[in-house]
Amino acid sequence: MEAPQMLGGDSKQAIEYLQKGLKMNPNHTMMRAELAQAYIATNRKGEAKKEIDAVLAAPPDPQHAPEQKDAVAKVQKLQQRLG
């Protein structure tokens, strides 16, 4: 389930929680992917692009490879939506 949906569809609330989460773990690529999606939902495309770029530039993490792969796939789809 995606972050905004977990919060009743409240993208602004999702942004707040995801930003706090990233302060604790700035390398969490799936949180960044979810944050990018929430930014797109609130028409904050520049900020979404920064998060997308951060996910795509993240070094491989063997410990979290499946999650990182999912995050990359998610942001690639978001990137297409941004154009």
Predicted feature locations:
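Short coil/linker segments at helix-helix boundaries
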Residues: M1-K23, K50, P59-V72
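Extended alpha-helical scaffolding segments
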Residues: A41-K45
